[in-house]
């Protein structure tokens, strides 16, 4: 499996480069995140949500990657001001190696709520 898009996506995420992140996602990407009530479908739907997140998050630090035949999972840390949380992203890749499905899992819950509150105040 070609992971060039995954590596470029994570580098863009660490730079907080929205366009760079989106360029490594399939047009029909599906995002499931604790920061939205339902699944977001397509790059146009993701853009404002991810842009808002990048405005409030200070850093993403990737710690470990796990790989299967058509997916990659990443364990990482997130810092937003004095808030720190752990995250796991599950990325299902298409044949071109673009991310076509992304499921975001964050913990602990109080930190997730605090980041969501920061997003609400920033909008």
Predicted ranges, named:
Residues 1-123:
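C-terminal and inter-domain tail/linker signature
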């Amino acid at each position: 499996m070609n992971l060039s898009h995954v590596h470029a996506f994570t580098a863009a995420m660490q730079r907080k480069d929205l366009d760079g992140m989106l360029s490594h996602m399939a047009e029909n990407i599906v995002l499931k995140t604790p920061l939205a009530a339902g699944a977001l479908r397509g790059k146009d739907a993701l853009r404002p949500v991810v842009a808002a997140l990048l405005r409030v998050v200070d850093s993403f630090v990737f710690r470990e990657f796990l790989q299967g035949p058509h997916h990659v999972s990443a364990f990482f840390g997130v810092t937003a001001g004095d808030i720190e949380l752990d995250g796991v992203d599950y990325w299902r890749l298409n044949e071109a190696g673009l991310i076509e499905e992304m499921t975001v899992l964050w913990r602990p819950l109080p930190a997730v709520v605090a980041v969501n509150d920061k997003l609400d105040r920033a909008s």
